[in-house]
Amino acid sequence: MRIDVKVGRGPSGRGVVQVYGAFEGDARPERLVPRAAANDRALGRLVAGAGFRGAPNETVLVPKNGAWYLVVGLGKAKDLSLERARQLAGTAAKAARARGFRRVNLPVFHERPLGAAGGVAQALIEGALLGLYRYDTLRRLPKHERGKRLETITLVVEQRREITQATAAARKAQILAEAVSLARDLINGPSNVVTPTHLANQARALAKQLRLRCTVIPFARLKRLGFGGIVGVAQGSAHPAQFIVLEYTPPHAKQTFVFCGKGITFDSGGISLKPAEKMEQMKYDMSGAATVLGTLKVAATLKLPVRVIGIIAATENMPSGTAQKPGDVLKTLSGKTVEVINTDAEGRLVLSDCLHYAKRYKPDCVVDLATLTGACVVALGSEAIGLFSKDERLVARLNQ
């Protein structure tokens, strides 16, 4: 994807669509943004005439003087935020691709709640790139999707002095979006492809690309070293467990952050077998591990001034003649013993070994990322995640 930054107006011509935003009104949009759109009365009449009101992510495509304009709803003006700008860009990018456009112009609009141009530019590029994400690796595109590919996104700033800021912000957004896409590809991959060994190989490739230190401890050595939590979960699978450590250590780093990721590449529940309905979704149980890999990619690419350690316990949780059973007692890496009552509570077992291993780095902060319990979905639905911490300052920073 090519990303350009222009002043005043973006490119025009065949295959180009200009995107504007609109604040929601009662019967018609309250106001178009940016200022150039708000001052275009003819465009305003065309948009209102199409029955468009400006509700969040509502779209309308109108032609005017040989050009195409895609207007996306921002909702009420009082609710404007960078997240709304991000959603606008994602909605616009998907709509533009679906309609066969090759290039899209996104305005870096000036509205008081949004702050400086750099923050707006980053939100727009993040939204556009993440909105365009599709997992196409294992599917044949249907005819109506073939050949439809957005090639260029142009950020249009109002003042020349904003070019440098917007360009740097767009680059950062691109790095973040690439890391998220890496994680999404791993999460979406089927479990017969994304095995524990596959995750280990991904970590090795990332380490080679970004000059990270990578350590992979195989199953046989985990048994000898006393990783009882991971070994107990892994012993029922034909795919050997992998304990993965990635280290990003910049010069003069004074702080150390550790991220532990649950990497259950398929969770059948083990002997305490899950219901058949939606069991295919249990390939997602390695989402924490995928997120850790994406986090290390971002840290190293952006050259963050802190040490970042990623720790991943990658295994399957399967029923077999060698699987752990309810009533078994395991000795974890910390030396504590655990009685297994339900083998489908495997997440806390593998994470206990990860977290104890993390202590050797004497971290300033530890974050574990895991699809640990369906109770979170019951309580919070798909709109929020569960976050637990004793450190209120850390919670506030993570919520940003």
Regions found by a protein language model. Give the residues of each.
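Short amphipathic alpha-helical segment within the helicase RecA-like ATPase core
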Residues: 1-263
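A generic structural signal for tightly packed, nonpolar segments enriched in small/aliphatic residues
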Residues: 57, 183, 200-400
